[in-house]
Design a protein with these regions (language model features):
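Proteins enriched for Cys/Gly/acidic motifs involved in redox and nucleic-acid/cofactor modification
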Residues: 1-216, 254, 259, 269, ...
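Terminal RNA-binding accessory module
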Residues: 2, 355-456
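Flexible glycine-/small-residue-rich
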Residues: 19, 245, 273-275, 396-398, ...
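Short glycine-enriched, charge-decorated loop/helix-capping segments at active-site entrances
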Residues: 59-60, 180-181, 220-223, 282-289, ...
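Conserved SAM/AdoMet-binding glycine-rich loop
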Residues: 85-92, 97, 200-325
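Short flexible coil/turn linkers enriched for glycine and charged/polar residues
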Residues: 154-157, 167-169, 265, 275, ...
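Conserved, mostly hydrophobic/aromatic
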Residues: 171, 191, 208, 243, ...
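Contiguous mid-protein beta-loop-alpha structural module that forms a pocket-lining wall or clamp
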Residues: 320, 327, 335-337
Length: 456
């Protein structure tokens, strides 16, 4: 179908996108939104008022499948759409993994598009409106580069900037390489030019995205390094740079130096450990040891003593013994994470770990998980306590969900910051501004205090 025909069908139709999962999925949703906008569609605030409902999915954990099926089924009870006809589309990792198999679980989905087929979603939706049939596209070898598509940003001050897609690591528990494909880096200058343009538009903060940003550039001519990219993005004038995700085996000394020497790179690093047991790390195919990881943490803190480290940890991987878990617990106590995402192992069909039977009772795994959570809560609280009676610059994102008279912001260490809206200002005047907050309360997951000085 040609672009004019797609526009004729879609122009004026409303759409709603619900996103599950990681930051890459959030950016994928922004790309779908930007594509629909380019064909004259209008964003709706809820599915009830949408002609097009899109679910961007994650398949890292089993619960994501169940949640998707529930969301799709809930669309059956929605009132008629504004145009009188509604198309339900499912994209992302579950769509890529299951393809036509989704149709056996949900009977009201009209469009299925995989992680490599985002550039074709408008055409697929238009065809579904036109002929009422189901349309599926999950080609793993699409040659259209969707990383350069237009997108609809959720905010004017922050932007997700993909620098690469895919993963070559094939950790034994992880489905991501099978649904996102092999690593593909974006051209160096294209990324720098994009950030330069974003700065001109008023963007103050960017998050560089990739399944493993530390391996950026290995597939490009000249093999530019992630460290070089950090420095170049820092030279664009953007005020804040975050990035995710980092694989410990690929975090080189030159990258640590670039982080320490580039003022715009924020003092925060997400460094997924997954387990503190060398034996389990080997079973996971992580390709580093407990000692390697702890040595890396020491090198990072030697260059950036006050950096906020966050991580991912899985409890209950097949074969994990009590001793293995104690190793994980002691590593968490040693590193003193500022934040951690902790998970109970979720079997993913098609991964090597899914073939291993584990006799460990669920109640034992749950008890271990709860012990780990308590350690993380303790270290996170202790880290935040270090911010008491300091002044923290917070980029304001909106208001607290519990109190619209209280600002919600983010510190350079990715901490949530609350402060009452200062007298003489409205929230509209402050969103996207940086305010200094004198911290007088430090809880486990947030800081709070009072605004001092003028917003900037």
């Amino acid at each position: 179908m040609d672009q004019r025909s797609v526009r004729d069908i879609l122009a004026g139709k409303t759409y709603f996108i619900r996103t599950f999962g990681c930051q890459m999925n959030q950016h994928d949703s922004e790309r779908v939104s930007g594509l629909l906008d380019s064909y004259g569609c209008l964003m709706a605030l809820d599915p009830e008022h949408a002609d097009i409902v899109v679910f961007m999915t994650c398949c890292v954990r089993e619960a994501a499948d169940t949640r998707l099926y529930g969301q799709c089924n809930s669309c059956k009870s929605l009132p008629p759409s504004p145009s009188g006809k509604r198309v339900v589309a499912v994209g992302g990792c579950i769509a890529q993994r299951d393809g036509e198999g989704l149709l056996t679980n949900v009977d009201n989905v009209n469009v299925i598009f995989g992680t490599h087929s985002i550039a074709h979603v408008a055409e697929l939706i238009a065809e579904a409106f036109l002929d009422g049939k189901r349309h599926i596209r999950t080609n793993e070898h699409e040659d259209t580069d969707a990383m350069s598509m237009p997108w609809h940003r959720e905010t004017q001050y922050h932007a997700w900037v993909p620098i690469m897609t895919g993963c070559n690591n094939f950790c034994t528990y992880c489905i991501v390489p099978y649904v996102r494909g092999r690593e593909k880096s974006r051209p160096f200058e294209e990324i720098v030019d994009e950030v330069t343009g974003l700065v001109r538009q008023g963007v103050r903060e960017v998050t560089l995205l990739g399944q493993n940003v530390n391996s950026y550039g290995r597939d490009l001519f000249g093999k530019p390094r992630f460290a070089d990219l950090l420095r170049a993005v820092g030279d664009t004038g953007v005020e804040r740079i975050f990035f995710t995700s980092s694989h410990p085996k690929d975090l080189l000394p030159e990258t640590i130096d670039a982080m320490a020497e580039t003022p715009a790179v924020m003092p925060q690093l997400h460094l997924a450990v997954q387990s503190g047991s060398t034996r389990i790390l080997k079973e996971m195919n992580r390709r580093y040891t407990r000692e390697d990881y702890l040595g890396l943490v020491d090198r990072i803190r030697n260059r950036m003593p006050d950096i906020a480290l966050s991580t991912d940890i899985i409890v209950g991987c097949p074969g994990e013994t009590g001793e293995d878990f104690e190793q994980t617990l002691s590593l968490a106590e040693t590193v003193r994470y500022a934040q951690a995402y902790t998970f109970i192992y979720s079997k993913r069909a098609g991964t090597p770990a899914a073939e291993i039977d584990d006799p460990t009772p669920h109640e034992v795994i749950l008890e271990r998980f709860n012990r780990l959570v308590k350690v993380i809560e303790t270290t996170a609280h202790e880290y935040n306590q270090g911010e008491l009676h300091t002044v923290v610059p917070a980029l304001i994102e909106g208001t607290s969900k519990k109190n619209d008279a209280v600002l919600l912001g983010k510190s350079p260490k990715n901490q949530t910051v609350h402060a009452p809206i200062p007298e003489g200002y409205s929230i509209d005047q402050l969103v996207g501004k940086i305010v200094d907050v004198d911290v007088d309360v430090a809880k486990t997951w947030y800081l709070s205090g009072s605004v001092v000085g003028e917003p900037r």
